[in-house]
UniProtKB/Swiss-Prot annotation:
The gene is UL97. It catalyses: L-seryl-[protein] + ATP = O-phospho-L-seryl-[protein] + ADP + H(+); L-threonyl-[protein] + ATP = O-phospho-L-threonyl-[protein] + ADP + H(+). ATP binds at residues 337-345, 359. It is an enzyme of class 2 (transferase). It comes from Human cytomegalovirus (strain Towne) (HHV-5). Phosphorylates and thereby activates the antiviral nucleoside analog ganciclovir used to treat CMV infections. Phosphorylation transform the drug to a toxic form, that leads to successful suppression of the infection, while the uninfected cell does not have this ability because it lacks the viral kinase. Mutations in phosphotransferase may induce CMV resistance to antiviral therapies in immunocompromised patients. Interacts with UL83. This is Serine/threonine protein kinase UL97. The keyword Ribosomal protein does not apply.
Length: 707
């Protein structure tokens, strides 16, 4: 017999006074259903407000009748008292009725001439739900004040927030009080603290990165939609470096509307949430969050209070934007430290950098990973004194702060990365061993304790600090950039980031494991490269969870081979870059462009030629020990590929083998093997190059980069 209970809209729970209200488990509602809930909540809120106004008017009328009786009794004794009491009664009636009418969002009697312009835009927002707010979801007449349910719906954010300040009801962006100017109220209340109203969130997924300059100079943004510009002007701060920038001209309104609709649709699919200072209620099944957790946090942190979800609470200080976002000098592009598909990296000071992502989903993933790593590493191993408070845990770089408004995360600053490091000497081989052991330990920790696969192990994502007195010596190394990271399959539907800034909860996407989206094409592990060449739609072969870690360590072996070539080639770094590395990256760009354009066959063809360059790297560094690698790869290509693709593979392999000769590295390899640290790195590279087929991923990861 099916249950007669039905799910109802959480925002419309006005008639119940149940303590500790918790929403029933809900299936993922559609956008139409959630919008219907919003309309029902608005109607119920309006009806409750009218009832509250009528009840208040009735009480005042009854009080007026009682006072009239008293006046009649006193009229025989003192005639002047009648006028006094009647006047006081009328004033009281006017005050209460005015307050009740004001709570019902009828504010014509307190409108000023300066408010007429905001009235037109407020009419549209009055259709949004305004409900009485108590921790127990009581009736409209209960409680000592009203909560206003504010719907923030812009091109890049859709959330609902309660504002409360005594007898204040929030409508749209400002807090209105009886007879006050809405433009004078520029602060909201959440979590018991005053918070300034923020400018609207600008999506960098569809606009170029903003240029901001210190000292209050206007920044440059693309033109947004009319509502976004209006909200920007209303919520701007009149003075200081945080002035809202004026939009650029030149973009059509139709294109802007299309972008806004697409962005809001995607955001609608992600979350729809209601929050106040007592509870954060989300559309995620059975999930409610406690905003009081933010009071004890200074960095993103995993709070394992629920066995069903991995909640990372992301706090934000009130003055974060003024201390971080507006303090970054973007006036000169020469200051920029890095740029790529993820966004841009700019220096903040000597010890910190700011990463401005192009997609908000990447920022959400970064802070969730940061909280997970920081919490799991806290009980595993004590940090070195030099890394305390820097956000580096177990060789993994984490974010120490986040701003969804500007799509910004704050990280520790390193000297350079391993790709741009140009000082390689055999005398510092011990520091190279420590660096790669740290990276291998970070990968094992990330897979075993955090159950997350990085999927982007490249020299560009390995940050290093060098000895200023000896630039060839690597002091410390850390793995960064989690834009391609995915949790293990058993973490699907469980990973959530909760933001204090917006009072919302954002779910981390489930793992997809499409091989074409995993790893840089030039550093992809050879077993996965072969699977992608045969089938561009292939996914990660999940026959066992140990395959994830083996794949990651195999990619780290490719990075090690990349660095060993720079270290051992007697021709020098310039020749290696113009010859060997140019061949390795020759078809990587074509593979990425084909993937962006949806030409998967062209992508697999480019990966086939990259496989030839990877094979040449191994054959050059290993010499006769690399013969098995070459023969196995050639047999695979001849058995799986067409004759024309085989000819193209052989032709490019011949070109690579002419440039990557073992004679160029033979003498330095002998010197490398004469040291214990060099022998360790050489054997580690040999073991990773032995992972050449899918079955090799079932090996023991402890044999790779052993401690």
């Amino acid at each position: 017999m099916s249950s007669a209970l039905r799910s109802r809209a959480r925002s419309a729970s006005l008639g119940t006074t149940t303590e500790g209200w918790d929403p029933p488990p809900l299936r993922r509602p559609s956008r139409a259903r959630r919008r219907q809930w919003m309309r029902e909540a608005a109607q119920a809120a309006a009806q409750a407000a009218v009832q509250a106004a009528q009840a208040a008017a009735a009480q005042v009328a009854q009080a007026h009748v009682d006072e009239d009786e008293v006046v009649d009794l006193m009229a025989d004794e003192a005639g002047g008292g009648v006028t006094t009491l009647t006047t006081l009664s009328s004033v009281s009636t006017t005050t209460v009725l005015g307050h009740a009418t004001f709570s019902a969002c009828v504010r014509n009697d307190v409108m000023r001439d300066g408010e007429k312009e905001d009235a037109a835009s407020d009419k549209e927002n009055l259709r949004r739900p305004v409900v009485p707010s108590t921790s127990s979801r009581g009736s409209a007449a209960s409680g000592d004040g009203y909560h206003g349910l504010r719907c923030r719906e812009t091109s890049a954010m859709w959330s609902f927030e309660y504002d409360r300040d005594g007898d204040v009801t929030s409508v749209r962006r400002a807090l209105f009080t009886g007879g006050s100017d809405p433009s004078d109220s520029v602060s909201g209340v959440r979590g018991g603290r005053k918070r300034p109203l923020r400018p609207p969130l600008v999506s960098l997924a569809r606009t170029p990165l903003c240029r901001r300059r210190v000292g209050g100079v206007d920044a440059v943004l693309e033109e947004n939609d009319v509502e976004l510009r209006a909200e920007s002007q209303d919520s701007a701060v009149a003075s200081g470096p945080g002035r809202v920038p004026q939009p650029l001209s030149g973009s059509s309104g139709e294109e802007s509307a299309t972008a806004v609709e697409a962005d809001s649709t995607s955001h609608d699919d992600v979350h729809c949430t209601c929050s106040n200072d007592q509870i954060i209620t989300t559309s995620i099944r059975g999930l409610t969050c406690d905003p009081r957790m933010f009071l004890r946090l200074t960095h993103p942190e995993l709070c394992e209070l629920s066995i069903s979800y991995l909640l990372v609470y992301v706090p934000k200080e009130d003055d974060f934007c003024h201390k971080i976002c507006y303090a970054v000098d973007m006036s000169d592009e020469s200051y920029r430290l890095g740029q790529g598909s993820f966004g841009e990296v700019w220096p903040l000071d000597r010890y910190r950098v700011v990463k401005v992502a192009r997609k908000h989903s990447e920022t959400v993933l970064t802070v969730w990973m940061s909280g997970l790593i920081r919490t799991r590493a806290a009980g595993e191993q004590q940090q070195p004194p030099s890394l305390v408070g820097t956000g580096v845990h177990r060789g993994l770089l984490t974010a120490t702060g986040c701003c969804l408004l500007h799509n910004v995360t704050v990280h520790r600053r390193f000297h350079t990365d391993m790709f741009h490091h140009d000082q390689w000497k055999l005398a510092c081989i011990d520091s190279y061993r420590r660096a790669f052991c740290t990276l291998a330990d970070a990968i094992k920790f990330l897979n075993h304790q955090c159950r997350v696969c990085h999927f982007d192990i490249t020299p560009m994502n390995v940050l290093i600090d060098v000895n200023p007195h000896n630039p060839s010596e690597i002091v410390r190394a850390a793995l960064c950039d989690y834009s391609l990271s995915e949790p293990y399959p058993d973490y699907n539907e469980r990973c959530v980031a909760v933001f204090q800034e917006t009072g919302t909860a954002r779910r981390i996407p489930n793992c997809s494991h499409r091989l074409r989206e995993c790893y840089h094409p030039a550093f992809r592990p050879m077993p996965l490269q072969k699977l992608l060449i045969c089938d561009p739609h292939a996914r990660f072969p999940v026959a066992g969870l140990r395959r994830y870690c083996m794949s990651e360590l195999s990619a780290l072996g490719n990075v090690l081979g990349f660095c060993l070539m720079r270290l051992l080639d007697r021709r020098g770094l310039d020749e290696v870059r113009m010859g060997t590395e140019a061949l390795l990256f020759k078809h990587a760009g074509a593979a990425c462009r084909a993937l962006e354009n949806g030409k998967l066959t062209h992508c697999s063809d480019a990966c086939l030629l990259i496989l030839a360059a990877q094979m040449s790297y191994g054959a050059c560094l290993l010499g006769e020990h690399g013969a098995a690698l070459v023969s196995h790869t050639l047999r695979f290509v001849e058995a799986k590929m067409s004759s024309c693709r085989v000819r193209a593979f052989r032709r490019f392999y011949h070109e690579c083998s002419q440039t990557m000769l073992h004679e160029y590295v033979r003498k330095n390899v002998e010197r490398l093997l004469a040291t214990s640290d060099g022998l360790y790195l050489y054997n580690a590279f040999r073991r990773t190059t032995s992972i050449i087929c899918e079955e090799d991923l079932d090996g023991d990861c402890r044999q790779l980069f052993p401690e």
